[in-house]
């Protein structure tokens, strides 16, 4: 017999806390410390697992009337007979889809022997629990009381509801506690409730391995890479999901408390998307649910239309259009002023100034609220990472201390689980093309969608990568292939902000290092982050839509360059997370302003300015980002480049391919900076050396294939012995010849090196008067010493990233890469005009310098295009070649537009930045034909054939479409000139008439 659903007051229902084997309640924990043997303490809590009764309603599927009596199986519904075997536990409250049902339930704890294994109960994450849960609070202090009641009741079924109040569910709403911080006290109180020292966090840590309470997580929110790794690759370490069951009838994702919280936390940027407009709280309190959903959708569409205000001085249509306001009020049943102000008002249309002020206040309020929420979230992310990935700083100046031998006082499994969940939540939303090719039709329909990265996700990823680079810096960027060998150069001391070495830090030289548990944890953590980042970059460049006009390529490249250039620890690590900086900010500004400043410092690009418009004073490619051979060049940077070689080569190849079909003006400046970094002599020579090792791996791979092919032939066709002996002799002779050739080449290379050294010595002897400079190691691009260590690292990366079949794509200096670069140069030469001439020439020169091929001659082409542009009236009289060039130049000079010929936001920004010209006569976009469409003609950009002052002044005075159209037609230069001529003729006629009549 199943227990029926009931009407339950979740806030008032108190459930006995779950006790551990020692009889101590988890809710009465006053102190908490993390040790390496924390697993033993946590596992003791799960010895007695209670069993509960309930009926759950899952949003993704229906599990009704299922009675599973297996010990190791999780079931959403349990029979009443199974509750008789529970020990000191009560049945958790299962939130139903309808909390207003008039049924009853009872909870009766029964005591039996604890030796009988029981089955935990799954609590469904139903949307009805989130929108109809009686948990209500108006500020952070009321939320503190609600949270305390939930903690005292050992969560039970309130866990889903309380997480929804903290981190939201699916749709954005104003009811989460992070959006209720109004002042500094609220921010401090909320951080104290959620940070690692809070009771909530300690309770989550205590229940890391406790599976007595499990929950259904929404399937649509789980990253696709997680589902792919568990179901297709069968990867179960670290365990981030307890159970997954996907078929045509149901989609179940079962997690425990720890997994549920950090999945919800890692996916919280979905709620932080600044482009999504949030509704006022009044719309969420509508009694009619069906009408409420329709009104919300219509209001969102209307608000998005009202936000398309004039951009960069080019008129589109007003924010308080009467048509939009009428459509808004008619579709939703609310007045526009009521929506934006949050109070009821009459349906009469107010003045335009009042409506504009209300709209501006609404936009400003929503933007500031989103910024507050984002700042608090990024602060919590940094504190959680500091808890699970700790590193040391000096007590005096706050610089990072390099100490790979330190012992990490954190549970290793817990740290890996946290890092895997956060990495997949931020980076694992899109699959690679090679992963999609192995899916069947059902899995392809589930996992093939592409999620475009939002600005909030990108800023969160930047914060995540910045912290992990600091963490890796303290381990000296060690490699598992070289930990038993001493470093080739002494480890550097921390560097202060003035550029001088710090003498207060205790960082010393790391002698031959043995594998320790902390190093093993670091290597596993680095694998998790590097694999997630590699798949993130590759999947984005593989599957981006080239027709999308709002691609965040500049921000993606910003993160990529920050990952590729970890040097210069002064500016990119120690200063950013220094305690002194926090103290100075606390003294100079308020706590809330300090929170904003701290978040901006965390999210600031690592020596990179990712402005889509292109900040010409970008720091990318400066001296701090270039790898140089001086006293600051250490073996760890060479080690880092070798360990991440395919981040440089494979993704750069995708960038070259995608740039051929995209407009690079949106990421032109960061693209130039990337080429400057790659063209630095030290990094270029190092990349060439590694690429030659990659070609050696390809040769070995081909030889292995040939050897296997010969063995297969010998197996199928038995050859005579004398033939086999002759073959062996021939192969031995070939091997001897190859060895002799290699020895000769090595001798020649050594002779060349000796000659170069002699020449350098002679030059030094000839110039004795010059001051002696510190000798730096020389890297010769001609001499390549085959290193087994490099070969092992490249082999590991090829297998780890699964790019063995991409032979030409993964080599930075392969023939395919050179051809892609030359093709991009040819395309850029055709797109050169007066506006982008300087920038495009820099890109072309950098590509030609990096791949060592001649620069194309493009001066004549520039002159031809400029002559044609200066004489538009002679197009019909030109020959066919001139016509083709003219049409091509017109397309390049014209800004980005919509299908109807109107400018979009990207086109307006191009005009504002002065990158393109808005021509009045364009054969591709005949503006004269657009007059038949009033709304389109009203949003038409101002051309040189119109008087802009009259149009702007008329648009400011009125919002009437007919009046605006009349002003737009009247403001034409030809029409005004003809009217002036007519008036002048009439005046001249009357003057002559009065002159003769007076006589």
From Swiss-Prot:
Organism superkingdom: Eukaryota
Membrane-crossing residue ranges in chain numbering: 976-996
Keyword Signal: no
Organism of provenance: Dictyostelium discoideum (Social amoeba)
Coiled-coil zones: 723-767
Cited PANTHER family: SPHINGOMYELIN PHOSPHODIESTERASE 4 (PTHR12988:SF6)
MF-aspect GO terms: sphingomyelin phosphodiesterase D activity; structural constituent of nuclear pore
Disordered: annotated span: 45-129, 873-904
Single biological process term from Gene Ontology: mRNA export from nucleus
Protein name per Swiss-Prot or TrEMBL: Uncharacterized protein DDB_G0293534
Keywords: Coiled coil, Membrane, Transmembrane, Transmembrane helix
Cellular localisation: Membrane
A single cellular component GO annotation: membrane
Membrane topology note: Single-pass membrane protein
Listed Low complexity bias regions: 45-128, 873-887
InterPro entries in the cross-refs: Sphingomy_SMPD4
